[in-house]
């Protein structure tokens, strides 16, 4: 998982970033450690100075990953379009845990369960579940729009319409 390089776009469970440097720093014991430095891709004027770093040896634990590939986007929509496995149960706690895995493909069943729960409970759909679902859709829309060079709005609509079709 250390195949990142300067210029790469990476993503965590919230934002898309760009690696702008690899530097050697000292850890708490004074030992040299190579680190990636990255910043949000769409930083506001106020956030332009916001940067983060992660030791190369800890990238696997950081939750950062490369953006989904174009083939991954196809697989995502293919899985999203399939009917929900009726054996799956809605577990709100597991939903949040799975989101932190930051894997679009593993997010599909969670998104489908949330959507199904929204349909079944209608106006009783919990506000927190609604917020989580919208956050997932927004994050996936941002990432897929960036990868496919399509608009956020069109990807957002495509995700929601695919969810609706697979739920009927």
Model-derived regions: residue spans:
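Short glycine-/polar-rich loops that comprise or flank the Walker A/P-loop
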Residues: 14-15, 34
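Short, well-ordered loop/turn sites that connect or cap secondary structure elements
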Residues: 3-4, 11
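Short solvent-exposed strand/turn elements
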Residues: 27-57
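Short, acidic/polar N-cap/turn motifs at the starts of alpha helices
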Residues: 7-9, 35
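Generic alpha-helical secondary structure signal
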Residues: 8, 21, 40-42
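Short beta-strand-centered aromatic/proline hotspots
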Residues: 15-25
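Short, surface-exposed secondary-structure edge patches
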Residues: 1-3, 26-27
């Amino acid at each position: 998982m250390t195949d990142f390089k300067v210029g790469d776009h990476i993503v965590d469970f919230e934002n898309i970033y760009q690696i702008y440097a690899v530097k050697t720093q000292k850890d708490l014991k004074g030992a040299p450690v190579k680190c990636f430095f990255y910043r949000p891709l769409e930083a506001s004027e106020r956030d332009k100075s916001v940067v983060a770093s992660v030791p190369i040896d800890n990238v696997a634990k950081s939750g950062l990953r490369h953006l989904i590939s174009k083939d991954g986007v196809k697989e995502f929509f293919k899985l999203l379009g399939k009917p929900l496995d009726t054996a799956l149960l809605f577990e709100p706690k597991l939903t949040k845990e799975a989101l932190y895995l930051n894997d679009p493909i593993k997010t599909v069943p969670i998104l489908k369960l949330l959507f199904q729960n929204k349909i079944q409970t209608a106006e009783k759909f919990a506000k927190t579940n609604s917020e989580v679902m919208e956050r997932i859709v927004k994050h996936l829309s941002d990432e897929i729009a960036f990868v496919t060079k399509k608009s956020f709005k069109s990807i957002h609509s495509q995700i929601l319409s695919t969810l609706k079709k697979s739920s009927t």
